[in-house]
């Protein structure tokens, strides 16, 4: 949670800073793309690494390394875009370990029957920092510059690493010491475990359906990430401060969505929650991108926070509920890679076609992708969830 606060401050400040000094969607998109490349190249492999390591200390080391990487920016002259891109790549390279390690540690510390509640609580805390993080980031950028955002992120990583080191984990989850093996044997075992994890996804119809649905949503999100900055600055005529407010409002919606998910979990089946929230995402996004009025965008973004949480958490929980624990890291490593690939494609489309086709047109296309996800997933997800409940999955 603490490192997430620094992340949000930094994530809001960086694209605004780059767009301010370059006025280019290509430059702004390059930052997002460079952050996705490590996830694409090493996401699934990172999951295999995590499965064979102590999850808690993996998270601690990742936070420390990311803090050191960001600190290097203070030794680079201001305005050097290449330096920001290089450090962003290094930071996200080690960061590929964080998601699979975090998901695996969560499963290791609670019962599977309480995963929905645990994930909902996690989302609530994540969205709480999302409320204050963007507003702080946008304001600090306007007042003190990008340096304060970097310093805040470094501080948050260091505090997070200390707190993670104090987490108590079951002895069965600690790193197991095995017999000595040769480097070649370890390498073959490493890639063998990674391949087995990918085969689980490819041969399980429910996992494949969920991954397909996520691919459309992350494609749309990649486009939005790049284009939302020029939309707010150019189309709406706002500043970094208002941009931070808009992102914070979505965090408020996320808090409400997490609370609603806790209440609806045992009353409403996963299928209608997922499909209805995806279709709502498309409608809300279309309205937001075609009515550039600040107050109206506030309202739409708040509702988008609600529907985003419901669809994403329920889809992720379906994976957690059914994946064998020894494959958990590998499955979410593959998920991390899928997210990176589809977001990278979306970011590339937005970066290179944004100035040619126009910001609003491409944002409308991204909104329609949410509708497509709901339509594609309607029959496939419903059928595979029925099969899964009857134990007929591959």
Language-model regions: role of each:
Residues 170-211:
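Juxtamembrane intracellular "pre-TM" segments in multi-pass secondary transporters
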Residues 1-38, 199, 203-250:
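Helix-loop boundary and gating motifs at the non-cytosolic
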Residues 41-44, 58, 62, 82, ...:
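C-terminal transmembrane bundle of multi-pass solute transporters/carriers
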Residues 104, 108, 150-183, 378-391:
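Helix-loop junctions on the cytosolic side of multi-pass membrane transporters
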Residues 20, 51-52, 77, 108, ...:
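Membrane-helix boundary and inter-helical linker elements of multi-pass secondary transporters
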Residues 13-22, 72-75, 132-154, 234-235, ...:
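Transmembrane alpha-helix termini and helix-breaking/packing motifs in multi-pass membrane transporters
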Residues 1-11, 34-48, 54-67, 83-142, ...:
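Substrate-agnostic recognition of the 12-TM MFS/MFS-like secondary transporter fold
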Residues 19, 72-73, 91, 164, ...:
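MFS-fold secondary transporters
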